[in-house]
UniProtKB/Swiss-Prot annotation:
The gene is KIF5A. InterPro entries: Kinesin-like_fam, Kinesin_motor_CS, Kinesin_motor_dom, Kinesin_motor_dom_sf, P-loop_NTPase. This is Kinesin heavy chain isoform 5A. Its EC number is 5.6.1.3. Residues 271-361 are annotated as: Necessary for interaction with ZFYVE27. The keyword Nucleotide-binding applies. Its main location: cytoplasm. PANTHER family: CENTROMERE PROTEIN E, KINESIN FAMILY MEMBER 5A. The modification Phosphothreonine is found at T397. Belongs to the TRAFAC class myosin-kinesin ATPase superfamily. Kinesin family. Kinesin subfamily. ATP binds at G86, Q87, T88, S89, S90, G91, K92, T93. Residues 353-1032 are annotated as: Interaction with BICD2. The modification N-acetylalanine is found at A2.
Length: 1032
């Protein structure tokens, strides 16, 4: 019951946001000019509101200026509404929600959630509060529950006081601000949001957060109730600016349509002359009917953009706010009378009714006297007020005369009509139930149809993509086949070249073998020469000793002869000189022979070098051509290694020859020194030995030049051998790389073949689905013909029914012609019933058509049902396995349960004195959730992890369902609060906990399937098995 009516206007507040980054980069101007706290000038025109907030206003200032008083009004029993209206990206969601868990940037809704409980905690302790919250959105003109996403099309009904409400919406009982924030987080995650050119997080629906507060005074039993609607409207959009396309464009159309309906309601209420206000044009205006011109205290936020780019939209928004400011609401306290108050009111109304009956009796007596022709004196007449009252009563009860006329109908006929009326009303009730069931079925089937259409569209898109990919893969496959053909041809050519090169290699190997034999012969010759050279050296040494001895003897003889003769010239005999020349001649012959042997060896080495270079060149060509053939390369590598070893051995032999050559050179130098000494001794023989000296010098120069050339040639050969070895290593690496690439190409080819096979199978499946779709179309045609025949039959039955009713009316008129008034009213009732029957017939036709349309979807649904059944079987198997795993982990969980037991005992000292009942009542005078006595009332990570671990272990114990475990006894005993034993194990404790927390008893709490929906702020709410609850 509502009392204490107060007329008040809608409070309109205007808020401008700052320029965003895009507007600053675009160079937009800041157009509003603020004049005081209640006016703003746009384009030279002033707009006046209750309050105007500039861009630098904080969230806290906005809340204190507008929303704080509404919290007090709602707690005092009034209804309240706060909603934000404006263009898209104007800051509506920031104003209403903000950042939920940021103390500085949180919006109106989280601040109201905290402020409500702060006021409650400071109120009288005799009051008890029950707080429920709901959260839903209006998306594409359908009401969608944000706390239960399965409810996608809720309806709007009226209660006994003709106040609109959303039927079937989820209602959650809360006992603290953190629980409200959790509900907001859950609903916000399910809300529709999209990206547009003007807003990265554009709301695509109107969201309504409803807080229903009921309070009861435990002493006086007085009850008050208040509702607070917190509405975040979607922004009006100009498609040319937002760039909406596809589904976003459809959302924009519905948003603008509903906002246009809101504007029409505001305009009609602002004019005040229209008798009809189009509340039913939109579900949003229907829900907010009481907030616009009804029993509510309403605050409207007008959110505007300060950019010159949005000049037109800003002016339109400000004009909308000015019209809304003229609307008058009649707010009253929602008070429920107590039994004593109802009794007093009943006595008062009883006395008033008795007085009215007396007045009616006097008026009837006076009226009968006037009809009988008597003249009633003025003293006996009733006073003017009483006569007016009697006239008013006569006007209010015209139906009683008709009822008296109806009574004159025969009892049998009246009973017959009453039975007919009861039957018809029963049929109406049955039809209503059937219509409700059919409408629910239609909604489900329509939703399934939409799902199937979406699936079909996605399947078609996937089919097109698959076709494109298939064509692309076919082209790639053709190209790959061509490449494979080319590779095969190249391999064939390489095989032919391989055979040719193999033959060439065999020939070269034979040639190399011949060269090796020749080289071995030359080496043997060189060894014999070395031995001969050593023998000659020995002979030469022996001769030199002999010559030295002879010369020494001669010198002694000459010295003695010179002493005897004096300074006479002494000449050696010719035989001695001839012997020396003969010795030198023999030495020169040996030296020339050695030179000729060395030249032949050098010449042969050059030939070998040329042959080696030619062979390496041919092997490099062979390596490039036969890179993909690993066997051939390995053979070449073996041969190259053998040749390299051979060259190394040749090089060693060359070094030995070089060393022997050096030793011969040293011996020659010694001989030259001795010859020099001999020349000094034999000065008189100088003209004869001059030719020999020149020959020795020429021979020495020639030997030196040959030695240097030989050293250079050997160094060059070593460098070339090293380079060839590097080339061989590089060829090995290249061969390995090419072999890996060939293996990769083969793997890719196999992968392409498998993908082609998969695409062909998918194409066959899509072809099969298309054939099934065509068959469904043919079945649909047959069903339409069947429905047409059924409609014709229904039409014939209706005609027969009308004829029957007409004949009955005619018979009743012939039997009692004097009861024309009763028959007339009966005809009206019959026509009313006929109209109802006709409407039911239309509804039935529509239902038949809908059913015919939906029957063709039955095969698909049956297929999905079979798939679902198979999935359920698989899940049951998985569940069975999980249970077996849980039984295995029982010992490990036991230790965790013991630890939690100690933690719960430690935390039990911080619980509140009064635990939550089914409806979670909130008592003033207790400490709030963040008080020192309840340190775990905050949303800290430690508390959340603690609660999660507690619930997880309890759930595992519930799944095990073993009464013998000590953990079951712990939960049964510790949750009762008295230490008494409890039967039933963890299953009974689990069910009891759900009942006491409002999850199984309250018919409006739709979270009965979520046993974990508790806050960490009150650990006792998880398992509150109190003695008083058990007693009740």
């Amino acid at each position: 019951m509502a009392e204490t009516n107060n007329e008040c206007s809608i409070k309109v507040l205007c808020r401008f946001r700052p320029l965003n980054q895009a507007e600053i980069l675009r160079g937009d101007k800041f157009i509003p000019i603020f004049q005081g706290d209640d006016s703003v000038v746009i384009g030279g025109k002033p707009y006046v509101f209750d309050r105007v907030f500039p861009p630098n206003t904080t969230q806290e200032q906005v809340y204190h200026a507008c929303a704080m008083q509404i919290v007090k009004d709602v707690l005092a029993g009034y209804n309240g509404t706060i909603f934000a209206y404006g263009q898209t990206s104007s800051g509506k969601t920031h104003t209403m929600e903000g950042k939920l868990h940021d103390p500085q940037l949180m919006g109106i809704i989280p601040r109201i959630a905290r402020d409500i409980f702060n006021h409650i905690y400071s109120m009288d302790e005799n009051l008890e509060f029950h707080i429920k919250v709901s959260y839903f959105e209006i998306y594409l003109d359908k009401i969608r529950d944000l706390l239960d996403v399965t409810k996608t099309n809720l309806s709007v009904h009226e209660d006994k006081n003709r106040v609109p409400f959303v039927k079937g919406c989820t209602e959650r009982f809360v006992s603290g601000p953190e629980e409200i924030l959790d509900v907001i987080d859950e609903g916000k995650s399910n809300r529709h949001v999209a990206v547009t050119n003007m807003n990265e997080h554009s709301s695509r629906s109107h969201s309504i957060f409803l807080i229903n507060i009921k309070q009861e005074n435990m002493e006086t039993e007085q009850k008050l109730s208040g509702k607070l609607y917190l509405v975040d409207l979607a922004g009006s959009e100009k498609v040319s600016k937002t760039g909406a396309e596809g589904a976003v464009l459809d959302e924009a159309k519905n948003i603008n349509k509903s906002l246009s309906a809101l504007g029409n309601v505001i305009s009609a209420l602002a004019e005040g002359t229209k008798s009809y206000v189009p509340y039913r044009d939109s579900k949003m205006t229907r829900i907010l009917q009481d907030s616009l011109g009804g029993n509510c205290r309403t605050t409207m936020f007008i959110c505007c953009s300060p950019s010159s780019y949005n000049d037109a939209e800003t002016k339109s928004t400000l004009m909308f706010g000015q019209r809304a400011k003229t609307i008058k609401n009649t707010a009253s306290v929602n008070l429920e009378l107590t039994a004593e108050q109802w009794k007093k009111k009943y006595e008062k109304e009883k006395e008033k009714t008795k007085a009215q009956k007396e007045t009616i009796a006097k008026l009837e007596a006076e009226l009968s006297r006037w009809r009988n022709g008597e003249n009633v004196p003025e003293t006996e007449r009733l006073a003017g007020e009483e006569a007016a009252l009697g006239a008013e009563l006569c006007e209010e009860t015209p139906v009683n005369d008709n009822s008296s006329i109806v009574v004159r109908i025969a009892p049998e006929e009246r009973q017959k009509y009453e039975e007919e009326i009861r039957r018809l009303y029963k049929q109406l009730d049955d039809k209503d139930d059937e219509i409700n069931q059919q409408s629910q079925l239609i909604e489900k089937l329509k939703q399934q149809m939409l799902d199937q259409e979406e699936l079909l569209v996605s399947t078609r898109g996937d089919n097109e993509k698959v076709q494109q990919e298939l064509s692309h893969l076919q082209s790639e496959n053709d190209a790959a086949k061509d490449e494979v053909k080319e590779v095969l041809q190249a391999l064939e050519e390489l095989a032919v070249n391989y055979d040719q090169k193999s033959q060439e290699v065999e020939e070269k190997s034979q040639q190399n073998q011949l060269l090796v034999d020749e080289l071995s012969q030359k080496v043997a010759t060189m060894l014999s020469l070395e031995s001969e050279l050593q023998r000659l050296q020995e002979v030469s040494g022996h001769q030199r000793k002999r010559i030295a001895e002879v010369l020494n003897g001669l010198m002694k003889d000459l010295s003695e002869f010179s002493v005897i003769v004096g300074n006479g010239e002494i000449k050696l005999p010719v035989e001695i000189s001839g012997a020396i020349e003969e010795e030198f001649t023999v030495a020169r012959l040996y030296i020339s022979k050695i030179k000729s042997e060395v030249k032949s060896v050098v010449k042969r080495c050059r030939q070998l070098e040329n042959l080696q270079v030619e062979r390496h060149r041919k092997m490099e060509v062979t390596g490039r051509e036969l890179s993909s053939c690993q066997l051939l390369i390995s053979q070449h590598e073996a041969k190259i290694r053998s040749l390299t070893e051979y060259m190394q051995s040749v090089e060693l032999k060359k070094r030995h020859l070089e060393e022997s050559y050096d030793s011969l050179s040293d011996e020659l130098a010694k001989l030259q020194a001795q010859e020099t000494v001999h020349e000094v001794a034999l000065k008189d023989k100088e003209p004869d030995t001059q030719d020999a000296d020149e020959v020795k010098k020429a021979l020495e120069l020639q030997m030196e030049s040959h030695r240097e050339a030989h050293h250079r040639q050997l160094a060059r050969l070593r460098d070339e051998i090293n380079e060839k070895q590097k080339t061989i290593d590089e060829l090995k690496d290249l061969n390995q790389k090419l072999q890996l690439e060939l293996e990769k190409l083969q793997a890719d080819y196999e992968k392409l073949k498998s993908e082609e096979h998969e695409k062909s199978t998918k194409l066959q499946e899509l072809t099969f689905l298309y054939e099934r779709h065509e068959q469904s179309k043919q079945d649909l045609k047959g069903l339409e013909e069947t429905v047409a025949r059924e409609l014709q039959t229904l039409h014939n039955l209706r005609k027969l029914f009308v004829q029957d009713v007409t004949t009955r009316v005619k018979k009743s008129a012939e039997m009692e012609p004097e009861d024309s008034g009763g028959i007339h009213s009966q005809k009206q009732k019959i026509s009313f019933l006929e109209n109802n029957l006709e409407q039911l017939t239309k509804v039935h036709k529509q239902l038949v058509r809908d059913n015919a349309d939906l029957r063709c979807e039955l095969p698909k649904l049956e297929k999905r049902l079979r798939a679902t059944a198979e999935r359920v079987k698989a899940l049951e198997g998985a569940l069975k396995e999980a249970k077996e795993g849980a039984m295995k982990d029982k010992r490990r969980y036991q230790q965790e349960v013991d630890r939690i037991k100690e933690a719960v005992r430690y935390k039990s000292s911080g619980k509140r004195g009064h635990s939550a009942q089914i409806a979670k009542p909130v008592r003033p005078g207790h400490y709030p959730a963040s008080s020192p006595t309840n340190p775990y009332g905050t949303r800290s990570p430690e508390c959340i992890s603690y609660t999660n671990s507690l619930f997880q272990n309890y759930q595992n114990l519930y799944l095990q369902a073993t009464p013998s475990s000590t953990s079951d006894m712990y939960f049964a005993n510790s949750c009762t609060g008295s230490g008494a034993t409890s039967s039933g194990g963890p299953l009974a404790s689990y069910q009891k906990a759900n009942m006491d927390n409002g999850n199984a008893t309250d018919i409006k709490d739709n979270r009965s399937d979520l046993p974990c929906g508790y806050e960490a702020e009150d650990q006792a709410k998880l398992f509150p098995l109190h003695q008083e609850t058990a007693a009740s």
